[in-house]
UniProtKB/Swiss-Prot annotation:
Protein name, UniProt field: Woronin body major protein
CDD domains, per the entry: S1_Hex1
Gene name in the database record: hex-1
Compartments where located: Cell septum
GO cellular component: cell septum; Woronin body
Length: 176
């Protein structure tokens, strides 16, 4: 992984190749995926300093070309900042990546008091699943759920046993 020193000079460690990580939060592995930096936009969710964060600023070093991301932790609302991973898979080829979370998809069963009741991919029921308080997601969920047109699904990010719905979609009849 790279870093910036106090004089704003970028440094890259030799073993900065992108890698999948596993955590020990709930006994199941919390996995990450590598995302090429040219695909990352403001508002995307990345893993910064080991925490799921929503990107609020992207900068690029003029000297090294390395990307730097500032994000807000989805669960604690703290700021985290990290530089992109740089790897050289072949001579004169430079690839910059960041780690992103693996999202889960749950089916919404009920909505109550600012949280949802949802069914996981394995059929377990999750009570009181919080919804991210941005991008009017709660209003969009309510509208889709009350319309009754298709099955409402939420994309969920988890961190050390805690989960939060961060986006939604409606799956219509033939794809249930």
């Amino acid at each position: 992984m790279g870093y910036y020193d106090d004089d704003a000079h970028g440094h890259v460690e030799a073993d900065a190749a992108p890698r999948a990580t596993t955590g020990t939060g709930t006994g199941s592995a919390s996995q990450t995926v590598t995302i090429p930096c040219h695909h990352i936009r403001l508002g995307d969710i990345l893993i910064l300093q080991g925490r799921p964060c929503q990107v609020i600023r992207i900068s690029t070093s003029a000297a090294t070309g390395q990307h730097r991301y500032l994000g807000v932790d989805l669960f604690t609302k703290q700021l985290h900042e990290e530089s992109s991973f740089v790897s050289n898979p072949a001579p004169s080829v430079v690839v910059q990546t960041m780690l992103g979370p693996v999202f889960k998809q749950y089916r919404v069963l009920d909505m109550q008091d600012g949280s949802i009741v949802a069914m996981t991919e394995t059929g377990d029921v999750k009570q009181n699943l919080p919804v991210i308080d941005q991008s009017s997601l709660w209003n969009r969920l309510q509208k889709a759920f009350e319309s009754g047109r298709g099955s409402v699904r939420v994309l969920v990010v988890s961190d050390h046993g805690r989960e939060m719905a961060v986006d939604m979609k409606v799956v219509h009849g033939s794809r249930l």
